[in-house]
């Protein structure tokens, strides 16, 4: 039996009193894997294994003069950096590997397989058509077709033991027209997308209200990257995401902790924050994991979920996030189950899928 067909003995409600303090790291990871995880914030275009990435670099002779370690340092972001802006510039280099549609399909398939192996039962992947097409001027319609085929093939091979939703990303870093085209692309393919997002450099999106209204009016809910970048002078990105764009969820949102007014606004609107702890640490948006605001946000009554963001860039997987939160902020299994139930309830996938998973695992 391969790991792709291995049955995971997911934790039940009456197993949450396991004494984690008696377990070593390897044993804890076995427990983390058994948590029925619902992940809402993971960039598909940056979700790959190191082995796969290096294989692509070598196959297409992208950096012939660099050793494997130097390739990692040039492209990826496994060590703490300076800022979100530095990360974005580094991630642009990764578009070197999006040479053809076969690679894109392999990324999609392997991402699903890897999430399943990590114990994820529901994953919402997000991707930017313009980001993938950027380097080699690929056709975004073919990119999308390839991604959907790759996901569907993987889910089928896994006998539908993992459920996948797809979110379209629009970016404002190039031009307003680029964002508008992404919105139109999302609406045109709304049978495949469960949501729409903004990513890239964090900014106040109030000037783009018309574009986001267009997406929402076509029945597509919004999740917006906001409250991530510690270098911004104010919290306007979060206020605009909630009050102007009417986002249902916020990507990151860790700076909500800076404002009692925002905490109350988030709770009033029942908005979930898609928290990505290791990402926040590596992008220098928190000083250390033990000072990460997720614990204070959780204790304040805000709904939060645990996510990997860009696991290919960070060389991480979802269970690393749980390990860090346990070691540094004393989260326990009951906390983790509650966060995953929130993530399931706030997912954009069809209600019948959510009802089925809730009955099975929660």
From Swiss-Prot:
Cofactor: bound how, per the entry note?
Answer: Binds 1 zinc ion per subunit.
A single BP term in Gene Ontology: inosine biosynthetic process
Q: Which reaction is recorded as catalysed by this protein?
A: adenosine + H2O + H(+) = inosine + NH4(+)
Keyword set includes Glycoprotein: no
**Pathway entry:** Purine metabolism; purine nucleoside salvage
* Required co-factors: Zn(2+)
Principal EC category: hydrolase
Identify the stretch(es) annotated as Gating helix loop: 169-183
Q: What is this protein called?
A: Adenosine deaminase
Which organism does this record belong to? Plasmodium gallinaceum
Q: GO CC terms on record?
A: cytosol; external side of plasma membrane
Q: Which residues does the annotation say bind a purine D-ribonucleoside?
A: 43-45, 200, 228, 252, 309
Superkingdom of the source species: Eukaryota
InterPro entries assigned to the protein according to its UniProt record, in alphabetical order: A/AMP_deam_AS (IPR006650), A_deaminase_dom (IPR001365), Ado/ade_deaminase (IPR006330), Metal_Hydrolase (IPR032466)
Q: Which family does it belong to?
A: Belongs to the metallo-dependent hydrolases superfamily. Adenosine and AMP deaminases family.
Q: What is its EC number?
A: 3.5.4.4
